[in-house]
């Protein structure tokens, strides 16, 4: 049983799939809501693990089948340069590997594609900011880092985590 929001307010969880191809391009989807681009993903659903959300959202938004590889980062949206919004949000970024499928649309996605990191389209800034993409590109090259949960402006590489959590 879940308590109504008026009883105990908790953060919403936004899960994003981080997917790069062999050309080092990142997969983005064009959101119907604002016509701008973001990493595949969305609100976490009750009954799904974060890994399952990343896989489900990627399949629904892109037509691709992926495997969730590892958690790259958990961030508190208010500690990063996102526009103000109505919810308190934690964002989870999960590195995924493409297993198959064909890029195809969905009811709430206008388009999808892979983009070079130095030639990104206009981003849906409530969902994905340029700093997200830069940080995920850096973190994916450091498998020794279990996950990242500190402020983006304080990250330095090589990064030695002071804590870790299992993911799998």
Predicted segments with their positions:
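Acidic, metal-coordinating catalytic segment for phosphate/diphosphate chemistry
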Residues: 1-16, 22
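Generic secondary-structure transition motif, activating predominantly at the C-termini of alpha-helices
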Residues: 2-7, 79, 133, 137-141
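Residues embedded in well-ordered beta-strands
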Residues: 16-18, 25, 93
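Conserved Nudix-box catalytic region and its N-terminal flanking loop in Nudix hydrolases
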Residues: 21-60
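Nudix hydrolase/Nudix homology domain
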Residues: 36, 107-168
């Amino acid at each position: 049983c879940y308590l109504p929001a008026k009883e105990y307010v908790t953060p919403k969880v936004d899960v994003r799939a981080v997917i790069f191809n062999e050309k080092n391009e990142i997969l983005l989807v064009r959101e119907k809501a604002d016509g701008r681009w973001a990493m595949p993903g969305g609100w976490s659903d009750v009954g799904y693990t974060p890994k399952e959300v990343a896989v489900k959202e990627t399949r629904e938004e892109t037509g691709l089948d992926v495997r969730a590889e590892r958690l790259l980062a958990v961030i508190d949206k208010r500690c990063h340069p996102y526009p103000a919004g109505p919810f308190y949000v934690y964002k989870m970024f999960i590195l995924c590997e493409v297993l198959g499928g064909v890029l195809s649309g969905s009811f709430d996605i206008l388009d999808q594609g892979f983009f070079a990191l130095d030639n990104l389209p206009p981003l849906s800034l409530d969902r994905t900011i340029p700093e997200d993409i830069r940080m995920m590109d850096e973190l994916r090259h450091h498998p020794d880092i279990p996950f990242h949960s500190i402020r983006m402006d304080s990250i330095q590489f090589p990064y030695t985590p002071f804590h870790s959590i299992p993911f799998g």
